[in-house]
Amino acid sequence: MLFKRKIYDKFLAWKEETCGKKALLVEGARRTGKSTIAEEFARNEYKSYILIDFARAPEEVRDYFRLHLNDLDTFYMLLSVQYGVQLHMRESLIIFDEVQLFPKAREAIKYLVADGRYDFMETGSLISIKENVKDIVIPSEERHIKMYPMDFEEFCWALGEEPLVRYIRDCFERKIPLERSIHEKGMLIFKQYLLAGGMPMSVVAFLEGHKDFGKADLEKRDILALYRNDIMKISARYRSKVLAIFDQIPGLLSRHEKRVVFKRIAEGSTAEQYEETF
């Protein structure tokens, strides 16, 4: 199930404004839909595309980056054969998915963009993409963009409520109240959004389950488990503190001030003890 996302227009702006002179790095939390929207964009806006998922890419593909960047004709030929995709000059996109898992590919962006044959897009998860840069030169030939979960407007689009969105916007711009029954409908959908959340997979579960909040909740729990597993992969120096903060989030959000109070994380803790962790 594909959803309309606002970030698509930002992808279009990048393509038109940079004309291949910069790669696009899409950063965001896991499961916000980065890979899905990147592939949809490639499918719609290019003659062909290659998606290299570094979570699954065979070792031979990684070797292409290690051995053949000094011969880009061979590099592109090997990628084309490996993925069975014909590449077209200035009409093909190459996506480095989960690029944080193979920093060498991100470092190669400098040379690949300078070559100018194809456009490049990278996707990466926030924590890991900042961790895994110690041994590489971060390319300046990147435009960074952050991707977030679906907002309320995108949630309405997913429910097929585009007319409602247009009506709300029109009333807002004209500074007039919504008609009562439409206001009630909008508030009902907003409450559904608050309960189902904006993670694409939880929205899919909600819709495919005929608006079953239980199925959406199960999907959200799976995502939380994934986040906890990701935290366990970061530096041991920060791990326990990050987990402590992560576990405090529901309680922090339930409070009026909605800010981190360090002494509530652990008895006697201070801001200085958590500065590097943040």
Language-model segments: what does each one mean?
Residues 56-90:
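Short glycine-rich substrate-engagement loop in P-loop NTPases that contacts/grips substrate
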Residues 111, 128-144, 156-161:
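Short regulatory helix/loop adjacent to the ATP-binding pocket of P-loop NTPases
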Residues 26:
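Hydrophobic anchor at the beta1->P-loop junction of P-loop NTPases
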Residues 95, 119-125, 146, 155:
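Structural recognition of the conserved hydrophobic beta-strand(s) that form the central parallel beta-sheet
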Residues 37, 41:
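Hydrophobic positions on the alpha1 helix immediately C-terminal to the Walker A/P-loop
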Residues 2-18:
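Pre-Walker A adenine-sensing motif
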